[in-house]
Regions:
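Solvent-exposed loop/turn elements at secondary-structure boundaries
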Residues: 173, 599, 606-613, 617-799, ...
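Transmembrane beta-barrel wall of Gram-negative outer-membrane proteins
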Residues: 256, 293-378, 401-425, 614
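Repeated loop/turn-to-beta-strand initiation elements of outer-membrane beta-barrel proteins
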Residues: 315-318, 361-364, 421-424, 494-497, ...
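Gram-negative outer-membrane beta-barrel transporters
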Residues: 580, 584, 594, 728-908, ...
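C-terminal beta-signal and adjacent terminal beta-strands/loops
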Residues: 724, 737-738, 833-835, 889-923, ...
């Protein structure tokens, strides 16, 4: 859709493997949908013995040992456990400090060694004296788990996304996009940033409006975070990228409390370099200052505290954590809209958890969490000719970011161990979102692209005014997300069968935007004086040539607001089958149903036919001793449509431009001496026919529409290297098989009706955009003036589109040294390529956030030469991180990321003659008349990011007090991450082309002091 204002566990892990298999208790582990639990299993006991576990959270369970001497506990809350072997009621052997890792299992086998050291935690970072490098012989997915112990050591930014970037296949998303509270986003496995799912303690916290990130925990409240980058089971859905799941801390039988203060002073932060124009424009020159970054500064402070312990010992526990982040920024904006911003962010987070052990068989967990961002900024004018600050203009009411945003969530989870073989889990929760933005208190129209003003009329300097933004959000915007799920796990013989339902409902109230000021803005443009601005005479989007020197202005109007809702349902079943002592096979099937409603509660998308998503995985313990594992999996993953899609695709949207020549510009940047330019309508034009009329839900989407889905295939191995190392490799192939976007080519629909013999005089207004499946034939309902509808069957060839393509290929190799009491380290290299003509639901190169309503596929001209390397592709990525206990009181840690740059684009007018047949402007894959596929003009530079940290924990304070210093980007590299892609045309170049949009953050330091009791 047009957007020309775009800037705006199964878990039996490593065992000695004969154990991990075919035991009469099931012999296989289970990963529930929430993936918040772990397992304990083992062998070496005698038939008739029993095994009892006692957790730090008061959980006590006891199971009999089977005829083969094996036992297993499933779906245990993560934490520390003592495992006792009992014979005739007396404890004859014991293992202490068995720590569980989320989604994995711990092998606690009994033998002659009776010390706690014989407990081998599979893939846990808690390593005992006789532990071997972990090779997981039972899990078939691709996951990275980072524990609270690692988080306390590694030099990381305090966000879920910064943690996720440790996982192979995860790369930083475009700087255009951010999450609900301003956090940067990630792309996983070539997916767009909206294709990830977020969880807290099993509750889906993904942004319900557009899928941009999700709500996360305070950093100090994270017990474990897992990142699933592929191969995950049928319990997970609504994700085609990855899953970021956090498990929060809980109270134990001992009271603990602590606090931390972090400080990032201005004085330790290097200044970014200024940005300059790269090409000559009408009123700018190459080398001229474009963005005055040199004086940008920032200071950050973070205060956090926690407390946890028993309210009733062995029965009722509480854990509370709070975090307050404050950021002060000085920012100078570019010559496009020159201002100085004095910004303040206050970002509070809260987490609370109650755990009630009702009895040995039933547990109730209640979680509350809150994530907020409060933003305030004073805006001042800025004079680029003198580099001086001007008078205060007012508050920043642009809505980017929102002044108040975030969410509060409350969940309850009930777990019942009905028998030793049957476990029931029920989860219910709500998340309430707030999205408040101040509305500019001005009736002056905003000025868009003042750099395109006629320099003969503005004195050679762009003229704008105090209105800071084109669009404003509804200040009453709120949302409610309700999640209800049931999971049932049953062990029978060599099978563990898990089934469940996963329901989610979203209500999005007062969503959308309108134009600021008087309800319209002025957008200055330049075009070839003798070529139509848009379309051709007789076409529905025709706008005549501007004449003169090619300068013109359009009156921009946008209004798309509504209250909408989404209903999502899913059912799944999965079987973990231990075929023999070396083979484990997992077979799953998931069925999703999605229904999206418009502003008057009418369904405009009803994707409720069975959408079967098979999941198949297998692992082979080659040598039978957990030293070499070969694994593979294949699966299909469906993606739901978020709530915001309805605003333009099914709402009463208004999006027009009215074109004029002008002879003057007043002191507020408003054009004077207006003369209308001829258009097809004789007035305002909408490229997508968005004229503010109610949208018939039957004409919002193709009647043959199918959900977006992706197929994935993974093959890999893990191998021990001696007794201290493990290495491996993994190949991943992902193919987007079906996508949803909007098409605006109503002429092609009209032509199809004519071929079908329809009398065009009886055809009602055809919508300017329909949701459809790119690359596939579609059926569209069109109003019949005599009553009812016509159905237009339009093939892909009729539209003139290529086939949809998004293919991701990745080859990962890694070497890891598990923590041995002294040091831990991991080195990972990934070669990957993401190639095709569709990034997914959004477009990173132009920053388009209209989910499934991008410029792509609107008209065939946009898809010419659109196939190339996609924006989230990074061919080479090297990651290395770890920690080293230098001395008893000193610890060092580091995190290094080296990555090749993202592909660059050059977007211009269409074809060799540089026309604009759609009226969109410079969004075609042509660069000054030459075809220009993504990546053809090269890549951005490689980035080299080195972060180092040192901690001093003195023995004189009983190691409860710690002092820390972290330096980010030690090398102070300043590389471009993204550049402005729109080139304009030969006769009307865009002066911003190739200017820097985003660059790596310069070097800065963080100082910290913490106390833990």
């Amino acid at each position: 859709m047009s957007s020309r204002s775009i800037r705006q566990a199964s878990v039996l892990r490593r065992s000695s493997l004969a154990l991990a298999l075919a035991i009469s208790l099931g012999g296989t582990g289970v990963v529930l949908a929430q993936s918040t639990t772990g397992n304990i299993f083992g062998t070496g006991a005698q038939p008739g013995d029993t095994v009892q576990i006692s957790g730090s959270t008061g959980i006590t369970r006891e199971v009999p040992v089977d005829a083969s001497g094996r036992y297993q506990f499933n779906n245990l809350p993560v934490g520390s456990y003592q495992v006792d072997l009992k014979r005739n009621g007396a404890v004859v052997d014991s293992r202490k400090n068995v720590n569980l890792t989320v989604g994995k299992g711990s092998d606690v086998s009994f033998n002659a060694a009776a010390s706690a050291g014989s407990a081998q935690s599979l893939d846990s970072v808690t390593v005992t004296a006789n532990s071997l490098p972990p090779v997981d012989v039972s899990t078939v997915d691709s996951r990275t788990v980072i524990t609270s112990e690692q988080l306390a050591k590694l030099p990381l930014a305090r966000t879920a996304e910064a943690i996720a970037l440790l996982a192979p296949g995860a790369v930083a998303g475009s700087g255009y996009f951010s999450g609900p509270t301003g956090n940067a986003l990630v792309s996983i496995g070539g997916g767009s940033v909206t294709e990830n799912a977020y969880y807290i303690n099993g509750f889906n916290t993904t942004d319900p409006l557009s899928g941009f990130g999700g709500i996360t925990l305070p950093y100090g409240a994270i017990d474990q975070q897992e990142v699933l980058a592929g191969g995950y089971g049928a319990a997970y859905g609504r994700s085609a990228g990855g899953v970021i799941s956090q498990v929060g801390k809980r109270g134990t039988n001992e009271w603990h409390f602590g606090a931390q203060i972090l400080w990032e002073p201005r004085g330790t932060r290097s200044t970014p370099g200024n940005d300059h124009y790269i090409i000559n424009g009408d009123s700018t020159s190459a080398g001229e200052l474009y963005n005055y970054n040199k004086k940008d500064t920032q200071m950050r402070t973070v205060e956090s505290a926690y407390v946890g312990g028993p309210l009733i010992k062995d029965k009722l526990y509480i854990f509370l954590a709070a975090e307050q982040e404050r950021v002060n920024q000085d920012r100078y904006t570019s010559q496009d809209a020159p201002n100085y911003y004095d910004r303040t962010y206050r970002n509070p987070k809260f987490y609370g958890k109650l755990d009630w052990n009702i009895n040995d068989s039933n547990i109730l967990e209640v979680t509350g969490a809150s994530n907020k961002q409060n933003y305030d900024a004073n805006v001042y004018g800025f004079d680029y000719s003198t580099l001086t600050r001007g008078d205060r203009v007012g508050k920043d009411t642009s809505g980017n970011p929102l002044n108040k945003s975030g969410a509060d969530l409350y969940t309850a989870k009930f777990t019942s161990y009905i028998t030793d073989d049957l476990t029931l889990t029920v989860l219910y929760g709500k998340m309430h979102g707030t999205y408040y933005s101040q509305v500019p208190q001005t009736q002056t129209p905003h000025i868009i692209t003042p750099n395109n003003q006629d320099p003969l009329l503005n004195g050679g300097s762009p003229i704008s005014n105090e209105n800071p933004t084109t669009r404003v959000f509804d200040p009453q915007h709120k949302s409610t997300n309700t999640n209800f799920r049931i999971d049932l796990s049953y062990h029978i013989g060599d099978h563990t069968i898990t089934a469940g339902m996963d329901n989610q409902d979203v209500r999005d109230t007062n969503d959308g935007q309108g134009t600021s000021g008087p309800g319209y803005a002025w957008e200055y443009q330049k075009h070839d004086p003798n070529t139509p601005i848009a379309g051709a005479p007789g076409g529905s989007t025709y706008v005549a040539a501007p004449g003169g020197a090619g300068f013109y202005v359009d009156r921009y109007v946008y209004d798309a607001r509504a209250s909408v809702r989404v209903k999502q349902r899913a059912q799944y079943i999965e079987d973990s089958w231990q075929v023999n002592d070396r083979w484990l096979v997992k077979v799953g099937l998931r069925n999703d149903q999605f229904t999206n409603y418009n502003g008057v509660s009418q369904p405009y998308l009803r994707l409720t036919s069975p959408q079967w998503a098979p999941r198949l995985g297998a692992t082979w313990d080659v040598n039978g001793d957990s030293s070499l594992k070969i694994y593979a999996n294949a699966g299909r993953y469906y993606l739901a449509m978020p709530a915001s899609v309805a605003l333009r695709s099914a709402g009463q949207s208004l999006y027009t431009r009215e074109y004029f020549n002008y002879t003057g510009i007043d002191a507020n940047g408003i054009p004077t001496g207006l003369t209308p330019i001829e258009t097809a309508t004789g007035g305002p034009i909408s490229s997508n026919r968005e004229y503010g009329l109610p949208r018939d839900p039957k004409t919002a989407a193709s009647t043959s529409l199918k959900s977006e889905y992706q197929d994935e295939f993974i093959l890999g191995f893990d191998k021990t290297l001696g007794d201290k190392w493990v290495y491996g490799a993994k190949a991943t192939v992902r193919k987007l098989k079906n996508a949803i976007d909007d098409v605006g080519d109503s002429d092609a629909i009209t032509a199809a009706l004519q071929r079908q013999g329809v009398d065009l005089a009886t055809v009602g207004p055809i919508q300017g955009s329909y949701l459809f499946n790119p690359g596939r034939a579609s059926d569209f309902m069109v109003p019949n003036l005599n009553g009812g509808y016509y159905t237009a069957h339009v093939t892909n060839a009729d539209f003139g589109f290529p086939q949809l393509k998004r293919n991701y290929y990745g080859l990962e190799m890694y070497l890891e040294h598990p923590f041995d009491g002294k040091w831990y380290g991991k080195l990972d290299y990934l070669y990957s390529k993401s190639y095709g003509n569709s990034e997914g639901q959004v477009r990173s190169d132009i920053g388009q956030q209209d989910v499934s309503a991008t410029v792509d596929w609107d008209y065939p001209q946009f898809m010419d030469y659109a196939s190339g390397e996609l924006s989230n592709s990074r061919k080479h990525v090297i990651k290395a991180y770890g920690s080293y206990q230098l001395a008893d009181e000193w610890m060092l840690s580091g995190n290094v990321t080296v990555a090749s740059g993202a592909p660059k684009s050059c977007l211009g007018l269409y074809g060799a003659d540089e026309s604009d047949p759609t009226g969109y402007g410079s969004y075609y894959h042509y660069c000054y008349g030459e075809p220009s596929a993504p990546g053809k003009v090269g890549h951005n530079p490689w980035t080299w990011l080195v972060d180092l940290s040192a901690e001093y924990r003195p023995t004189w304070a009983d190691k409860k007090l710690a002092f820390n210093v972290t330096v980010f980007n030690v090398l102070n590299t300043r590389e471009r991450l993204a550049t402005y892609p729109q080139a304009g045309g030969i006769g009307a170049v865009d002066p911003n082309y190739r200017t820097t949009l985003y660059q790596t953050t310069p070097r800065y330091a963080r100082f910290g002091i913490s106390y833990d009791f």
